[in-house]
Amino acid sequence: MGRLLAIDGLNIVRRVYEASPEPDSDLKAEIALRHALSSFRNLITDHQPTHVLPAFDFGGATWRHQLYAGYREGRAPMPGVLREALPEFYQRLAGFGLRVVSLPDVEADDVIGTVVLRWLAEDRGAAVVATTDKDLHCLVAQGALVWDHFKSEWHDHAWCEKKWGVPPEQLPDLLALMGDATDSIPGVSKVGLKTAAKLLRTYGTLDAIMAGAGILKDTLGETLRKEREMLYLSRQLVQLKTDVRVGVSWNMLAWESA
């Protein structure tokens, strides 16, 4: 059986870059990408994959911006020196034997979701996603495992339930309810993690919650009814797009160990 390692590329690159307190500079970018390359190598050494998917955001507007103009409006842009250094970094990854996938109009999350689900559907073996991004943890429900490279820990079904109070299959509904400030996804006013998790444990799904909201006489019921449209828009925004035309074959992602 095979083993797919999907790497959320910018999740690693940006965290390494931002961990350094120095001001933005070409030297800072060079050092950060050198460390990021070591992280990629360590991931491959530690997980011994048969296939590797290094996925990176292409940049610019995506299908989510078309749905909601305010998407990610509060997120700080990538430092220019780091963005300018990425093409050379991709070349270094290619020289290392990796096939970088970076597609316009979609995010790396969508590419990873598409490829991981296809891999699992074809029963090709284990799928590991190297990321700290909460959006990708919904893939745990389909049989993937998430690896936090920075904490060296596995995130499985039990970890997700302990962290968020719901199983991974309910994570998109949870994020839709509570919103996600990182991506400027509004969610429902004054609904935080605990309230969102309690609603999902009680009702099970977003649709069931909204059906029940019709008889709730308290402020929460009123808010849910009032913000129904934004809630379902938020649900679309947090949902992974899993039908991306990735344009690579399994052979292109195959990893030949030295």
Protein language model features and the residues they cover:
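Noncatalytic, basic helical substrate-engagement surface that gates or grips nucleic-acid strands
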Residues: G2-A130, L136-E153, E229-L233, Q239-S257
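Non-catalytic nucleic-acid-binding/docking modules located in mid-to-C-terminal regions
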Residues: P49-L53, G143, H155-A258
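Acidic, divalent-metal-coordinating active-site segment for phosphoryl/phosphodiester hydrolysis
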Residues: K134-D135, K194
